[in-house]
């Protein structure tokens, strides 16, 4: 199996390095390539770089960095910039959760989404903290060992979130749906050294829907959550309402 690894924290980030070394040391008879941003590009979502050139830097040992977004990285990695055609894409391990509404902003999930767009089964994995990357690596490894039994095709993305706890404390894996966060906190305002007003985006909101069956609930209770995602934002329930409304309007 040929696996393309990417992330949004950058190619040197501890999460992607932990997963890279775990997979290499355990030798799953897989061919690996790592292509990730040259710096932290968290919350880049599905953005592509269109107005400036992209450059790939070869760091040896099949590790590459790109002066672009996570989506750029996967796009280049699959679409002809490298002599490598992966069987699947894995994005992560992210330092921090990607649950609920986070998936709309997440560069980690976006890298997996690009893999899906380009016809590859894709997985995004995040650690809900920044300490126990070995726990998330082990969860990912167990999935790889059983991948031949996993009915994952290119229309589905698996979004995995792992509690930041030792592996022996993990209770198991739950299949979940996305929860929901409250709105983000207000922006943080301050001044730069020259006295100019500057702003920082506020923290993500707390969980609003963390009921049983959600990713929030699973992680809070010591389980890794696995949420299957699809890319269809259509609000089907509203279609009939809008049809009825527009039928009575003259254009």
From Swiss-Prot:
Subcellular localization: Cytoplasm
Entry superkingdom: Bacteria
Cofactor(s) needed for function: a divalent metal cation
InterPro entries given in the database record: SurE, SurE-like_Pase/nucleotidase, SurE-like_sf
Catalytic activity from the UniProt record: a ribonucleoside 5'-phosphate + H2O = a ribonucleoside + phosphate
Keyword terms of this UniProt record: Cytoplasm, Hydrolase, Metal-binding, Nucleotide-binding
A GO term from the CC aspect: cytoplasm
Cofactor note: Binds 1 divalent metal cation per subunit.
Keyword set includes Transcription: no
Any one Pfam family match given in the protein's UniProt record, by short name: SurE
Residues at which a divalent metal cation binds: 8-9, 42, 94
GO MF terms, alphabetically ordered: 3'-nucleotidase activity; 5'-nucleotidase activity; exopolyphosphatase activity; metal ion binding; nucleotide binding
UniProt-listed Enzyme Commission number(s): 3.1.3.5
Keyword Disulfide bond included in the entry's annotation: no
Role this protein plays: Nucleotidase that shows phosphatase activity on nucleoside 5'-monophosphates.
PANTHER family named among the record's database cross-references: 5'-NUCLEOTIDASE SURE, 5'_3'-NUCLEOTIDASE SURE
Membership in a protein family: Belongs to the SurE nucleotidase family.
Name listed for the protein in its UniProt record: 5'-nucleotidase SurE
């Amino acid at each position: 199996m040929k696996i393309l690894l990417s992330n949004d924290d950058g190619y040197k980030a501890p999460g992607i390095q932990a997963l890279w070394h775990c997979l290499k040391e355990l030798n799953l008879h897989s061919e690996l390539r790592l292509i990730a941003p040259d710096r932290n590009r968290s919350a880049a979502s599905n953005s592509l770089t269109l107005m400036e050139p992209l450059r790939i830097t070869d760091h040896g040992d099949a590790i590459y960095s790109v002066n672009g977004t996570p989506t750029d990285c996967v796009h280049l990695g699959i679409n002809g910039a490298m002599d490598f055609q992966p069987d699947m894409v894995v994005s992560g391990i992210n330092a921090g959760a990607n649950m609920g509404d986070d998936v709309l902003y997440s560069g980690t999930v976006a890298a997996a989404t690009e893999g899906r767009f380009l016809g590859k089964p894709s997985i995004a994995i995040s650690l809900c903290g920044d300490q126990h990357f070995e726990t998330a690596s082990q969860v990912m490894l167990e999935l790889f060992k059983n991948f031949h039994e996993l009915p994952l095709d290119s229309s589905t993305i698996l979004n995995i979130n792992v509690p930041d706890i030792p592996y022996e404390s993990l209770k198991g894996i739950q299949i979940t749906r996305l929860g929901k966060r409250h709105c983000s906190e207000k922006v943080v305002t301050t001044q730069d050294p020259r006295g100019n007003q500057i702003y920082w985006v506020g923290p993500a909101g707390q969980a609003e829907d963390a009921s049983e069956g959600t990713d929030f609930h699973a992680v809070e209770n010591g389980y890794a959550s696995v949420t299957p995602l699809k890319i269809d934002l259509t609000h089907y329930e509203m279609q009939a309402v809008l049809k009825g409304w527009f039928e009575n309007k003259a254009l």
